[in-house]
């Protein structure tokens, strides 16, 4: 999207490691309008300090912070409380939870959502969900907290098991101390749940 579609609309992207706030700030240009990142990132599970990135808005007031929170929905992580302006989710994953809806949601202040709705909906990004798909997404939200907590508990147990396996070279999971700085940030902002997603490298 950022390399092939957005340039058609006069939008260019600079790619940086958002876990490194100094690198993010160094990449800001006069015409920068958005800092967009996914945390934890797929598939590396690197964790961006949302509050630290959001502090850049104190210096660069025209910039919006957009966080893809698909891997860490409530009750794991609350980007807006940490200073983000807009949060996006693929509701096909955790929010729906039943594999029978394809869609996404954008969350934020009414003023920001009004701009997105007026400029993008139906013109660029597609149409709203059908009523039945919306109903099924709401159905999934009723069990979201229960499902997510169990996913996270199971993922942590599996990650710890894999980390001690002779067949596994490296496990990437924010809830493991071996993730270093990513773990430290995850402890601070992910409410002790981390995520239900794991990636790992198998030994040759």
List PLM regions with ranges:
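Conserved small-domain helix->loop->beta segment predominantly found in fold-type I
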Residues: 156-204
